Amino acid sequence: MSAFDMSHGFFPREPICPFEEKTKIGTMVEDHRSNSYQDSVTFDDVAVEFTPEEWALLDTTQKYLYRDVMLENYMNLASVDFFFCLTSEWEIQPRTKRSSLQQGFLKNQIFTGIQMQTRSYSGWKLCENCGEVFSEQFCLKTHMRAQNGGNTFEGNCYGKDSISVHKEASIGQELSKFNPCGKVFTLTPGLAVHLEILNGRQPYKCKECGKGFKYFASLDNHMGIHIGEKLCEFQECERAITTSSHLKQCVAVHTGKKSEKTKNCGKSFTNFSQLSAHAKTHKGEKSFECKECGRSFRNSSSFNVHIQIHTGIKPHKCTECGKAFTRSTHLTQHVRTHTGIKPYECKECGQAFTQYTGLAIHIRNHTGEKPYQCKECGKAFNRSSTLTQHRRIHTGEKPYECVECGKTFITSSHRSKHLKTHSGER
């Protein structure tokens, strides 16, 4: 066969070759087909990028989720009629801002890169034996060697498996068709899973209960239910944990291990989100402002809790006594007053506490640490609340007023003592 036979439908079929020359990860997809009227969209427009430092902070579950999202972006571009070359294996490195990513390959591992390449397709190459159409001469030659039992390219990045897959596809045994756009693909494991997602299937099945999930990360979280929803090795802990990242944070709280450290003051934190929030204190950033009183906050959680002061909403209620709280953590601490549970014990003297912050403050009595220092006089304290009260000596602020006589006080405890003089209590 020396020319295109349009009656056999060879030309309309999209050429998908697993042997096209690999390009650098994230190469922009710049051209539509010649008859397209839409503006060009690049892979960079939909890509999610990480620096090597940020990538190192992700756990395995988060990396699997990244793979799933990038695959979906990749296939969405394909579905709007882009040409691309699909390799049979995925690069095992994150798509980053400062990395060449010219690394090796591992099968069926975490997907972390997408490779796409623009082609002009000014000239089509036809296999006269089977009618397969190729975009480049290199692909056709590789295809012919595979058909003739020639060089299998052992030692290159694709290997025998890719030759076999391509050979099967070239003789009409397409492994799958992407129905939304009619494209034909030779499947990799990752692509096979993604096609199931696009077709509404849930490829990740729980072996315990049979429930299906679209993403591996969702299945990983679900598995925590079957192992008791509590992976924390500390028996006194009441947290229900279903993910490995939450477990690491919880263990860090109990052991005192803090791996994230700020460059400005050297203070350490158990997780990156706490470090980010603390970094704003050095920059003076307060992004969330209350419209009621003008007070500003560095994070949304503190802002939302503050708003409840104005609204009076206390959604967390104690079933024992009916007392309500603005935060669930405050309710948890309160419940321990009914149960008598004090899970946090000092290893030095054995004194126990209902909350971890109480233990942390108590330990400073043994170590002599006083991290809160007054900028006016240099006096240091082991509690931030004590420093706040001390500052009022310098500012002259007395926010606590007696409703009986109008006298004001620096602390609420001083006002409480004063009120007893009016009531006659001792």
UniProtKB/Swiss-Prot annotation:
All copies of domain KRAB, residue ranges: 41-120
Protein name: Zinc finger protein 562
Main localization category: nucleus
Lineage: superkingdom: Eukaryota
GO molecular function: DNA-binding transcription factor activity, RNA polymerase II-specific; RNA polymerase II cis-regulatory region sequence-specific DNA binding; zinc ion binding
CDD domains from the UniProt entry: KRAB_A-box
ZnF (C2H2-type) intervals: 176-198, 204-226, 260-282, 288-310, 316-338, 344-366, 372-394, 400-422
PROSITE patterns: KRAB, ZINC_FINGER_C2H2_1, ZINC_FINGER_C2H2_2
PANTHER family (alphabetical): C2H2-TYPE DOMAIN-CONTAINING PROTEIN-RELATED (PTHR23235:SF178), KRUEPPEL-LIKE TRANSCRIPTION FACTOR (PTHR23235)
Signal peptide (residue range): none
Protein family per UniProt: Belongs to the krueppel C2H2-type zinc-finger protein family.
Naturally occurring in which organism (per UniProt): Homo sapiens (Human)
Gene Ontology terms: biological process: regulation of DNA-templated transcription
Keywords, in A-Z order: DNA-binding, Metal-binding, Nucleus, Repeat, Transcription, Transcription regulation, Zinc, Zinc-finger
Described function: May be involved in transcriptional regulation.
Compartment list: Nucleus
GO cellular component: nucleus
Chain segments annotated as transmembrane: none
